[in-house]
A protein has these predicted regions:
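Short, solvent-exposed loop/turn segments at secondary-structure junctions
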Residues: 25, 69-70, 134
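Short Fe-S-cluster ligation motifs
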Residues: 132-178
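Conserved AdoMet/S-adenosylmethionine-binding subsite of the radical SAM
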Residues: 1-51
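Local cysteine-cluster metal-coordination motifs and their immediate loop/turn environment
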Residues: 106, 114-133
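Structured helix-beta-strand junction loops
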Residues: 14, 57-58, 125
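A C-terminal junction/extension of Radical SAM enzymes
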Residues: 31-33, 38-109
């Protein structure tokens, strides 16, 4: 909390909000970070209240990412971290979101989110990461990196699945007087 307060003090007036999320213990995370523990409900509530208190002190509202909606009672905004409103404020444009737009994952109300990477390719080595199986597999994959390839790692290989990503604009071009 002391570190968060120091960061909040430095960023005061420079950011619109802060997003918090608690560690999810995926199988890969358990394997790579065995000492990690699930953050219990009471600890989540305590930490959220403290983040909100500190955030208020420095003008930084706290939002949660895919967490228990009950954290709203602790003062956090639980509506999502990449909502229509957030994106409109960031871009200065109105958006018209199709009704069929689905959430990225259960409990998520964010509009944007696509996997653009590949498992076992990040070399940062964060022990809580869900995207890497282990360091050895990452090192093996990195050997195939080709800066001239449109692929993140190497080129097309047997068994690769390529998904066409439909890109559509949600920009609302309708002019308004008010």
């Amino acid at each position: 909390l002391k570190s968060f307060e120091k960061i909040a003090q430095e960023l005061s007036g420079q950011v619109s909000f802060c997003v918090i999320s608690f560690l999810d213990l995926y199988e890969k995370t358990k394997r790579n970070f065995p000492e990690a523990k699930e953050v219990g409900k009471s600890d989540q509530e305590f930490l959220t209240r403290e983040f909100v208190r500190i955030g208020k002190q420095y003008g930084i509202p706290i939002r949660t990412c895919c967490e228990n909606p009950d954290l709203e009672k602790c003062g956090a905004d639980v509506t999502g971290c990449m909502t229509k409103e957030v994106l409109e404020q960031a871009t200065g444009c109105r958006l018209q979101i199709p009704q069929k737009k689905k959430a990225v994952r259960d409990g998520c109300s964010c509009l944007l989110g696509s996997d653009i990477g590949m498992y076992n390719t990040c070399q940062h080595g964060c022990v809580y990461c869900y995207a890497n199986y282990d360091k050895k597999t990452v090192a093996e994959n990195i050997r195939f990196h080709d800066p001239a390839s449109p692929f993140l790692i190497g080129g097309f290989r047997e068994g690769d699945i390529i998904k066409e990503a439909k890109q559509e604009s949600y920009f609302d071009a309708q002019l308004r007087l008010f």
